[in-house]
Amino acid sequence: MALSMPLNGLKEEDKEPLIELFVKAGSDGESIGNCPFSQRLFMILWLKGVVFSVTTVDLKRKPADLQNLAPGTHPPFITFNSEVKTDVNKIEEFLEEVLCPPKYLKLSPKHPESNTAGMDIFAKFSAYIKNSRPEANEALERGLLKTLQKLDEYLNSPLPDEIDENSMEDIKFSTRKFLDGNEMTLADCNLLPKLHIVKVVAKKYRNFDIPKEMTGIWRYLTNAYSRDEFTNTCPSDKEVEIAYSDVAKRLTK
């Protein structure tokens, strides 16, 4: 006679959820592909410290079992205790609500401004990289630089909790590692994958570098590249370049 222990002797709230993340595969059909939304969820789950599995989905030959699991849905999506969830923003909210303290880290930023910092960069970058008219290039590059400058200023401006009101020292520049402090938050999971794409693609197809004078952005990227949560969820530079090979337009007269 088979005996079943209630949840292996664990209370419902103590049992690890069964989570599977499905992300876009790279050009080889197996490695991690270029998809900032896939990386965003990958980073969130990694930072939460929860056990989860990752499956890369080759969009060219999507397996039948995945078609049945999430019909008509492109990655990223997750299954959480066998329930399919497909909207990235809603998945983020759900994970933050369900995977909560004391067992899991809270990842919401303390400062609301961190959520919107750099939010317009990707749109300006897309316009810049998709443009094929040489006469429009300079203005579009200026537009991108303006949004990068705004992010740089935010990263270099001290947050309220960096300023000690009782100290005689006047702190003019922030030394924090990430958008909202010295730890990654949901805001970083959203922005960093996009900022990395901007850096790689603009260099490859426009020979554009983020100016070294933007010390806040470079400090931010350097700190991100030192973290497994970012580098191990990131597609290779080659994969990012391949993804944009048809999107990035040559400047032709």
Curated annotation (Swiss-Prot):
| Residues bearing PTM Phosphoserine | 4, 132, 167, 236
Variation of activity with pH? Optimally active at neutral to slightly alkaline pH.
- Tell me a Gene Ontology molecular-function term this record carries: oxidoreductase activity
Concerning InterPro entries, the annotation shows: CLIC, CLIC_N, Glutathione-S-Trfase_C-like, Glutathione-S-Trfase_C_sf, Glutathione_S-Trfase, Thioredoxin-like_sf
Tissues expressed in = Detected in epithelial cells from colon, esophagus and kidney (at protein level). Expression is prominent in heart, kidney, placenta and skeletal muscle.
Q: What induces it?
A: Up-regulated by calcium ions in differentiating keratinocytes. Up-regulated in myofibroblasts.
Recorded topology in the membrane: Single-pass membrane protein
Q: Which UniProt keywords apply?
A: Acetylation, Cell junction, Cell membrane, Chloride, Chloride channel, Cytoplasm, Cytoplasmic vesicle, Cytoskeleton, Endoplasmic reticulum, Ion channel, Ion transport, Membrane, Mitochondrion, Nucleus, Oxidoreductase, Phosphoprotein, Transmembrane, Transmembrane helix, Transport, Voltage-gated channel
**Which residue stretches belong to region Required for insertion into the membrane?**
2-101
Activity regulation description: Inhibited by rapamycin, amphotericin B and IAA-94.
Give the sites modified to N-acetylalanine.
2
Q: Which CDD domains match?
A: GST_C_CLIC4, GST_N_CLIC
Modified sites of kind Phosphotyrosine: 244
Q: Which GO terms describe its cellular component?
A: actin cytoskeleton; apical part of cell; cell surface; cell-cell junction; centrosome; chloride channel complex; cytoplasm; cytoplasmic vesicle membrane
The listed locations are:
Cytoplasm, Cytoskeleton, Microtubule organizing center, Centrosome; Cytoplasmic vesicle membrane; Nucleus; Cell membrane
Bilayer-crossing residues are 37-57
Modification sites for N6-acetyllysine? 24, 130
Which stretch carries the motif G-site? 35-38
Which SUPFAM superfamilies does the record cross-reference, listed alphabetically? GST C-terminal domain-like (SSF47616), Thioredoxin-like (SSF52833)
Q: Which reaction does it catalyse?
A: chloride(in) = chloride(out); thiocyanate(in) = thiocyanate(out); nitrate(in) = nitrate(out); iodide(out) = iodide(in)
Enumerate the NCBIfam families for this protein: O-ClC
Protein's job: In the soluble state, catalyzes glutaredoxin-like thiol disulfide exchange reactions with reduced glutathione as electron donor. Can insert into membranes and form voltage-dependent multi-ion conductive channels. Membrane insertion seems to be redox-regulated and may occur only under oxidizing conditions. Has alternate cellular functions like a potential role in angiogenesis or in maintaining apical-basolateral membrane polarity during mitosis and cytokinesis. Could also promote endothelial cell proliferation and regulate endothelial morphogenesis (tubulogenesis).
| Family in the record | Belongs to the chloride channel CLIC family.
Q: How does it assemble?
A: Component of a multimeric complex consisting of several cytoskeletal proteins, including actin, ezrin, alpha-actinin, gelsolin, IQGAP1 and CLIC5A. Binds directly to brain dynamin I in a complex containing actin, tubulin and 14-3-3 isoforms. Monomer. Interacts with HRH3. Interacts with AKAP9.
Annotated domain remarks: The active G-site contains a monothiol Cys-X-X-Ser motif which mediates glutathione-dependent redox catalysis.
Q: What is this protein called?
A: Chloride intracellular channel protein 4
Organism name: Homo sapiens
